Amino acid sequence: MNNFEFKNPTKILFGEGQIENLSKEIPKNSKILMLYGGGSIKKNGIYDQVKEALSNYEVVEFGGIPANPEYSVLMKALKLIKNENIDCLLAVGGGSVIDGTKFLSAAALYKGDSPWNLLTDNKPITEGMPFATVLTLPATGSEMNSGAVITREETKEKLAMGGPGLFPVFSILDPQVIRSIPQRQLANGITDAFTHVLEQYMTYPTGALLQDRFAESILQTLVEVAPAILKDPADYNAASNFMWSCTMALNGLIQQGVPGDWAVHAMGHELTALYGIDHARTLAIVGPNHYRYNFESKKVKLAQYAERIWNIVEGTVEEKANIGIEKTEEFFHSLGINTKLSEYTDEYSETGSIVSKRFTDRGWTGLGEHKTLTPSDAEKIIEMSY
């Protein structure tokens, strides 16, 4: 096991009826900017619950944060923060709204020329305006981590940021919100969380037995509850386990002491930036072929994964590893997720070379757990995914 330091300061309020406890967690006299997305919270009752809980606070609202939080939209919210002297942010939404709020948390205190530099400078964010979240769509784990990804349509870019200053102060997770989530978004959430775990697990053995079992337990839980969630999102037990699995998949715990491989995310972000494909679906497009391309360096963990998640106990290491990849694709297909780029766009023929050039221009010359995956390798993986 590798050395590590681990701290996660986010408080979690989990369960039915927790939204009403907002007023117990936010300091009195706070002036709150409440941020949300396309307005679904006004249809499913969450908006009314939040407003009722905040009835004794001064609350300014900003809606319309899109599925991939757009820089130009967030800049309008930043202007509102400064004009209204906001001192507390509340994200009511899924990963996109929460990621956008994290950007605003950092941008509100930023002293530089352009807040976009927060994403291009590749420096950890050490301070931000206090913010909290009410999670409405389990998927990204953003409610309990310090990372965010922001899109800039003008330049077709999608870049990440993060640091110790971007943890939510607290997050409210009420599994009842899941009953109103459309099937497509539920499938995306399962796929997103599943891939998050794989990226922290599917590398090479380091003797981190507990971390492996943590990761495998999340994967097994997602496989187990996926059919129940898609059949009946109002199944509270299934919803609870789904929601908590998504949070645990990316709150920092399972990545401690082990190598990580975030190349799938890096490539997936480019597919979203170029074609607007749902984030989770880009991971399903790239992930299996990433494992095929890097088979030799990952086959031991792939075989372990096949044994422990899919009960593949017969065959050589190579045979089990290959079946593990096939089972992963089958799982995505069972959720209604297509795994070929050509199933999402007809304009895919130059995608590999475009992504390779972007990685080269950014200096991303060594991705993956060994820091050896080159832009040329990324090009080949994406071409395998056509």
Annotate each language-model stretch with its function.
Residues L302, I309-Y386:
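C-terminal charged capping/lid subdomain of soluble metabolic enzymes
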Residues F194-L198, A239-L250, G287, T328, ...:
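Short alpha-helical scaffolding segments that buttress acidic/His motifs in well-ordered protein cores
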